[in-house]
Amino acid sequence: MTDIGTLNFTWSQAIIGGFVAAGITDAVISPGSRSTPLALAMLRQAGLRCHIAIDERSAAFFGLGLAKSSHCPVLLLATSGTAPANWLPAVIEASQSGIPLILISADRPPELQDCGANQTVSQPGLFGSHTRASYTLGTPEPGFNPGYLHRVARQACEQASWPHPGPVHINQPFREPMLPSEPVLSGEMPEKISISHPDLQPDLNALGDLARRISGRPGIIVCGEMPSRDGQNEALVALATRLRSPIFAEPLSGLRFGPHDRSHLCVRYNDWLGKTDLVSQYRPEWVIRFGAYPVTRNLQKLVSEITETHALVDPWPRWIDPARRLTHLLRSEPAAICKALLDLSLVPFSETWLSALAKFEGNAEADEQRNHIHVLLEEVPDDTDLFVGNSLAIRQMDTHSGSADKTLRIYANRGASGIDGNISTAAGIAASRGRAVALIGDLTCQHDLGGLALAQGQNIVIIVVNNGGGGIFDHLPQRDLPEFTQGWRTPQNVNFEHAAMAFGLGYAATHSDDDLRPALRHAFAAGGPHLIELRQC
């Protein structure tokens, strides 16, 4: 008769083998005792790259970064108790932003539930509506069918990947002992399961109606964060060219940087939209939005004021319409919609529309005051992955980054827009891509100091803009309150030198944009993890 420890391990071998057969290449393991069978199966699984992360909250955001940059599901493993609960912020972000994660929580067996057993909490359904699916498997039983577990793994991968990528939770109880009593051979290879997805073709009737509404009329294209696809940028530019329409391109759209035609882009809108009533002055009659809703309030306001024809292109089954203005929702890939519209009779609008917006863009560029965003984008190497923190950092990137031929892939956690886990996410991107740069604020850094442990050994440069607390509130109405300093600005007296030293990161303190440039050059040339603090207070 197979002993329980060996049974636990062979069961774990089967399910982890199923995940690897489904194409998963990365696992993030937070050490614990109850999860030992699964951890051992992961560590002994050829083809699975295992990352060890002590803190489960950081581990989950690290996995998020891996999955965000690779576009493939990533395994997370934690022991029982509060350990998996620490995943929740990253799970919410993954759900909101469409990032595939497989969450495997080890658990106590049924007989230890609801009786005061140590390190035992109710784990089934722990993440509520934030998962695409949630399973609690039975305890391993003698004579189990490995094919069942292979298919559970394949099903979980599919649900995490399509039609709307996101987290899937598997809760796995084990009885003691946790270790096999004898050597165990590798399990049988999972049977290949062939899966095909439908090609989301544009609805020609809906497109015909949209084409009639936009042809020969002034309008705008707005591109927010969206998954990158081959030919997508070129298709968007081709549609804008045909319509003589500007593209309001956010940093996360993938349109601001790269060798493609950028002549139709508006990228300094956050400056001039605050000074110009574009809707009343030029009366745009339509907007076509691609991807997530805009980050900045000026662009949000513009989008919300265009009500006659308001279209959203999004292949994922979600509803992105905070302004409640939609007239058309097109479930297809952006490139497919653009190409289908180009096959219809579209009349371009007058050149004066583009010329007026180009003048606004030119004036904003001429008036631009140089700052750390310009220095960073000038110095960052070509073909780099750049993670931008939430709060003030992403808004400054939106306002000041401009556009360039340099190939940059820009990321941010804009699903739920939290400032937690940002360093860990950037470290995950670095682990996946081989190099990353992160731009974050001082409060964001404080929120994820443990993420510096995951930066160890990574080729990552972290720039911390230390403005002494909640600098974003300087730009919000709360600044006029008498309690502003105490309740919102929350001045901090923190420098990050010793934090960097504690985790073995190179460190440089800079006090101006002129100081920042040589510090960046040194860090990029040296490689390895560096933290550069730009002190603005």
From Swiss-Prot:
Swiss-Prot/TrEMBL catalytic activity: isochorismate + 2-oxoglutarate + H(+) = 5-enolpyruvoyl-6-hydroxy-2-succinyl-cyclohex-3-ene-1-carboxylate + CO2
Family matches, as Pfam families: TPP_enzyme_C, TPP_enzyme_N
The keyword Ribosomal protein is annotated on this UniProt entry: no
Keywords: Magnesium, Manganese, Menaquinone biosynthesis, Metal-binding, Thiamine pyrophosphate, Transferase
GO terms for MF: 2-succinyl-5-enolpyruvyl-6-hydroxy-3-cyclohexene-1-carboxylic-acid synthase activity; magnesium ion binding; manganese ion binding; thiamine pyrophosphate binding
Signal peptide residues on this chain, from the entry's feature table: none
One BP annotation, GO: menaquinone biosynthetic process
Cofactors named for this entry: Mg(2+); Mn(2+); thiamine diphosphate
Gene3D superfamilies, alphabetized: 3.40.50.970, TPP-binding domain
Keyword Oxidoreductase (UniProt): no
Cofactor binding: number and manner: Binds 1 thiamine pyrophosphate per subunit.
Pathway: Quinol/quinone metabolism; 1,4-dihydroxy-2-naphthoate biosynthesis; 1,4-dihydroxy-2-naphthoate from chorismate: step 2/7; Quinol/quinone metabolism; menaquinone biosynthesis
EC annotation from Swiss-Prot or TrEMBL: 2.2.1.9
Family: Belongs to the TPP enzyme family. MenD subfamily.
Assembly notes: Homodimer.
HAMAP family linked: MenD
Job description of the protein: Catalyzes the thiamine diphosphate-dependent decarboxylation of 2-oxoglutarate and the subsequent addition of the resulting succinic semialdehyde-thiamine pyrophosphate anion to isochorismate to yield 2-succinyl-5-enolpyruvyl-6-hydroxy-3-cyclohexene-1-carboxylate (SEPHCHC).
Name the UniProt record assigns to this protein: 2-succinyl-5-enolpyruvyl-6-hydroxy-3-cyclohexene-1-carboxylate synthase
